[in-house]
Swiss-Prot record:
Organism of derivation: Homo sapiens (Human)
Cross-link (Glycyl lysine isopeptide (Lys-Gly) (interchain with G-Cter in SUMO2)): K15, K57
Record-listed Phosphoserine modification sites: S296, S539, S569
Tissue and organ distribution: Detected in a number of cell lines.
Gene3D superfamilies for the chain: K Homology domain, type 1 (3.30.1370.10)
Stored PROSITE patterns: KH_TYPE_1
UniProt protein name: Far upstream element-binding protein 3
Upper classification of the organism: Eukaryota, Metazoa, Chordata, Craniata, Vertebrata
Length: 572
């Protein structure tokens, strides 16, 4: 032994003795395992024949046997399917999952219930555990089912005429269906006469889809199911594409769609949203613009609320648009109706419809059209009502010295946009004597016959009422718009007062434009005399002077615009 301590190697004989001793211990353990009665038919853990020794049976030690028995029991975990009545799943799960948690704790078996029955009267459950724990779980589940069947009130709650239907609600929509404080699900139950239960807890993991159980008459259950699915669809269609048949309409509300020309969108919204807030507060509705598709000459505003309030808000919006047209000169587009051309309706269904053209400008002038930060092209879009954009990918064989712009809109809008682009690039049309005289804005009509109507006899939006859910309730406007002196028109005019120029500053540009105000005044005087000479049951109000003043303002405005454009081109 001293030699071993000093690190010398042990003799070969001692190594052989150690191996024999270890082998002897292995044989003893194998003999004990083989001597266990209920393991006699099983395969031994260690086969002594591998080492060339026979099996020797030894007395069983109690401690070792108990440990080995526990290991054997751990290996006998199985899975079994068990079915329970679909109508009683809620009773088995219990409030907050208390019942099913108690069953699992008492039996030692894990219970997983399928989320839906797929229309069959029984719901499959998966039981996982030892055979003893599975049997215990079956016994406890059977007790609950028997107690529910024989208990009082069960048949009162679910009779032969009632049906139960479950729909799986996405986890992100559970709160939407329940509502704040359970308000939405309460309204659904009151309106449909069914009972709804959202199964929040149970074996389902957190964040998973939750089943909504609907109990009641078959027809009412189906109606409630459709209403729930409609709420979910509404949430998914939050981009407001298409006319929205929204759930609030069933609760006493509704929505209409009002078309707003592009140039008037900013006017309806107002500075920092002040105007649209004022409209909402005054009418008691909610207004939201649909996303801009970049193509249509109009933007759609969704007005949501009671029908009468929606109509009131639509009327206010139309007043703002008409006021803006009168004030900023866009009224010529609508005023052109009845001047012999019959053009200028803002609606998409106007004569000619929405068109698209390609307009070419020199490459070195492209920056003048776009402007710093896109200011010029935005101004062109606002003033014309058309949509102008630069073609990013020109045709392969196109001239590199030219740039192409795409203009979309009705013919009048396209023509105005072309005129504005020519101003920016200094085109030949800029200095022509009749540059603006050829546009629908300021061109005087030929002497009309007696049946010619005044330029604004039908108002700016003749088709607006038809667009509002197909309910034409609009009243034709006769003569100049009277609302210019009302609150909404004056509000917009007040915003525009700082930008007005002194009349003396407009005198020079006016001299370059032919003055048609006198001709229009004479024309309306003749019309007035002819109308007074004819026998009428009731004489309409005389708008002669008002129309004369209106056309003086039109000539003054476009004369000023032309003068500014000429000065700008001379500076360049």
């Amino acid at each position: 032994m001293a030699e071993l301590v000093q690190g010398q190697s042990a003799p070969v004989g001692m190594k052989a003795e150690g191996f024999v001793d270890a082998l002897h211990r292995v044989r003893q353990i194998a003999a004990k395992i083989d001597s266990i009665p209920h393991l006699n038919n099983s395969t031994p853990l260690v086969d002594p024949s591998v080492y060339g020794y026979g099996v020797q049976k030894r007395p069983l030690d109690d401690g070792v046997g108990n440990q080995l028995g526990a290991l054997v029991h751990q290996r006998t975990v199985i899975t079994e399917e068990f079915k329970v009545p679909d109508k009683m799943v809620g009773f088995i799960i219990g409030r907050g999952g208390e019942q099913i948690s108690r069953i699992q704790a008492e039996s030692g078996c894990k219970i997983q219930i399928a989320s839906e029955s797929s229309g069959i009267p029984e719901r499959p459950c998966v039981l996982t555990g030892t055979p003893e724990s599975i049997e215990q779980a079956k016994r406890l589940l059977g007790q609950i089912v028997d107690r529910c069947r024989n208990g009082p009130g069960f048949h009162n709650d679910i009779d032969s005429n009632s049906t139960i239907q479950e729909i799986l609600i996405p986890a992100s929509k559970v709160g939407l269906v329940i509502g704040r404080g359970g308000e939405t699900i309460k309204q659904l139950q009151e309106r449909t006469g069914v009972k709804m239960v959202m199964i929040q807890d149970g074996p389902l993991p957190t964040g998973a889809d939750k089943p909504l159980r609907i109990t009641g008459d078959a027809f009412k259950v189906q109606q409630a199911r459709e209403m729930v699915l409609e709420i979910i669809r509404e949430k998914d269609q939050a981009d407001f594409r298409g006319v929205r048949g929204d759930f609030n309409s069933r609760m006493g509300g509704g929505s209409i769609e009002v078309s707003v020309p592009r140039f008037a969108v900013g006017i309806v919204i107002g500075r920092n949203g002040e105007m649209i807030k004022k409209i909402q507060n005054d009418a008691g509705v909610r207004i939201q613009f649909k996303p801009d598709d970049g193509i249509s000459p109009e933007r759609a505003a969704q007005v949501m609320g009671p029908p009468d309030r929606c109509q009131h808000a639509a009327h206010i919006i139309s007043e703002l648009i008409l006021t803006a047209q009168e004030r900023d000169g866009f009224g010529g587009l609508a005023a052109a109706r009845g001047r012999g051309r019959g053009r200028g309706d803002w609606s998409v269904g106007a004569p000619g419809g929405v068109q698209e053209i390609t307009y070419t400008v020199p490459a070195d002038k492209c920056g003048l059209v776009i402007g710093k930060g896109g200011e010029n092209i935005k101004s062109i879009n606002q003033q014309s009502g058309a949509h102008v954009e630069l073609q990013r990918n020109p045709p392969p064989n196109s001239d590199p010295n030219l740039r192409r712009f795409t203009i979309r809109g009705v013919p009048q809008q396209i023509e105005v946009a072309r005129q504005l682009i020519d101003e920016k690039v200094g085109g030949t049309n800029l200095g022509a004597p009749g540059a603006f005289g050829q546009s629908p804005f300021s061109q005087p009509p030929a002497p009309p016959h007696q049946n010619t109507f005044p330029p604004r006899s039908s108002g700016c939006f003749p088709n607006m009422a038809a667009k509002v859910n197909g309910n034409p309730h609009s009243t034709p406007v006769s003569g100049p718009p009277a609302f210019l002196t009302q609150g909404w028109g004056s509000t917009y005019q007040a915003w525009q007062q700082p930008t007005q120029q002194v009349p003396s500053q407009q005198s020079q540009p006016q001299s370059s434009q032919p003055n048609y105000s006198k001709a229009w005044e004479d024309y309306y005087k003749k019309q007035s005399h002819a109308a007074s000479a004819a026998p009428q049951a009731s004489s309409p109000p005389d708008y002669t002077m008002a129309w004369a003043e209106y056309y003086r303002q039109q000539v003054a405005f476009y004369g000023q615009t032309l003068g500014q454009a000429q000065a700008h081109s001379q500076e360049q």
